[in-house]
Amino acid sequence: MSKRDFYEVLGVPKNASDDEIKKAYRKLAMKYHPDRNQGDAAKPAEEKFKEAKEAYEILSDAQKRAAYDQYGHAGVDPNMRGGMGGAEGFGGFAEAFGDIFGDMFGGARGRGGRQVYRGNDLSYAMEITLEEAAKGKEAQIRIPSWESCETCHGSGAKPGTSAKTCGTCQGSGTVQMRQGFFSVQQTCPHCRGTGKIIPEPCTACHGQGRVKKQKTLEVKIPAGIDDGMRIRSTGNGEPGTNGGPPGDLYIEIRIKKHDIFERDGDDLHCQVPVSFITAALGGEIEVPTLQGKAAIDIPEGTQAGKQFRLRGKGIKGVRSSYPGDLYCHIIVETPVKLTEHQRKLLKELDESLKKGGAKHSPSTESWTDRLKSFFS
């Protein structure tokens, strides 16, 4: 049987944001929770959840989503997480709930019974130039990192002492609480789910068993990246608790304002000033591009605002097959600080042009006619 479209499975459009995808998955996870689907409904619910889980795993990962968007199901490995098929069993089913409900309620249950928490995601803003965005680059960044405490060797206990089993939960990290007819399992309030009590905490790490330091990370910026895009570095967020998975690091790209170019998607725009003599008589001018210099032939009688397009002189975006174009917008420059001789020459030129009327200044003549019609 062919697989359904992943966007259809989650009920979201193809341009859905990460938050929309996550919310849709949460809704399905709650709907097909095993506690809500017993008896004959259990098996169909499990299949529905597996389908939603697979869709979420692909669409929540930027690289996998890009491959799926381009090639469909053939672009992603259906066994990338080692168990989408029927052999997964209830263990994998429960593990999948840990991913989503851990986000919702703070943590999932580990195999030893202790509360397992996923680490928090980290964000990092990186500023790059337009040239670096176009070509791509490799950079180093420093981010906070947790390392095992050298004083207590990660135990959290003062040297010479050791952690004790929590007497409240007997080391399980959870306690049973009765609410009417129901018995609810909750995190032990005494040890906070660790199953251990540290009578004498290590003074270096304050009983955490780890200390915060800085680490250097190599980051590859892909060519064509645009302002506001994020790069996900899996597992480089804050570490999890009690064996929980680490969070992710999201690097947000910010592109510095350029002195010459403005970016619009894959296209670039720039303003090119030319003298009114060149605009009137025409000629060749030199313009800058990200690849170097280029020449443009300015035709005779070029007006201010005229736009010239240089194909392929823009930027090739991250998901683009071809580079964009460069648009040069002409600004006709009016001369300033004229000498008396220059003023005289311009006045003579003006008188000569006026005699030609619409022949030399079609826009001015048309404007004059419209004004006469307006005030008449």
Curated annotation (Swiss-Prot):
What is the first-listed, main subcellular location in coarse terms? cytoplasm
Report the cofactor remark.
Answer: Binds 2 Zn(2+) ions per monomer.
Q: Which cofactors does the annotated protein need, by name?
A: Zn(2+)
Biological processes, Gene Ontology terms: chaperone cofactor-dependent protein refolding; DNA replication; protein refolding; response to heat
CXXCXGXG motif repeat start and end residues: 149-156, 166-173, 188-195, 202-209
Q: Where on the tree of life does the source sit, at the highest rank?
A: Bacteria
Which of this chain's residues are annotated to bind Zn(2+) 2? 166, 169, 188, 191
Query: Which residue windows does the record flag with biased composition (Gly residues)?
Result: 237-246
* GO annotations of cellular component type: cytoplasm
Any single GO molecular-function term of the entry would be: zinc ion binding
Which CDD domains has this protein been placed in?
A: DnaJ (cd06257), DnaJ_C (cd10747), DnaJ_zf (cd10719)
Localization, UniProt: Cytoplasm
Enumerate the spans annotated as J domain: 5-72
Q: Per UniProt, which keywords does this protein have?
A: Chaperone, Cytoplasm, DNA replication, Metal-binding, Repeat, Stress response, Zinc, Zinc-finger
Supply the SUPFAM superfamilies for this chain.
Chaperone J-domain, DnaJ/Hsp40 cysteine-rich domain, HSP40/DnaJ peptide-binding domain
Assembly and oligomerization? Homodimer.
**UniProt record similarity statement:** Belongs to the DnaJ family.
Give the NCBIfam families listed for this entry: DnaJ_bact (TIGR02349), PRK10767.1 (NF008035)
Q: Regarding domains, what does the record say?
A: The J domain is necessary and sufficient to stimulate DnaK ATPase activity. Zinc center 1 plays an important role in the autonomous, DnaK-independent chaperone activity of DnaJ. Zinc center 2 is essential for interaction with DnaK and for DnaJ activity.
- HAMAP family named among the record's database cross-references: DnaJ
Q: What protein is this chain from? A: Chaperone protein DnaJ
Organism whose genome encodes this protein: Acidovorax sp. (strain JS42)
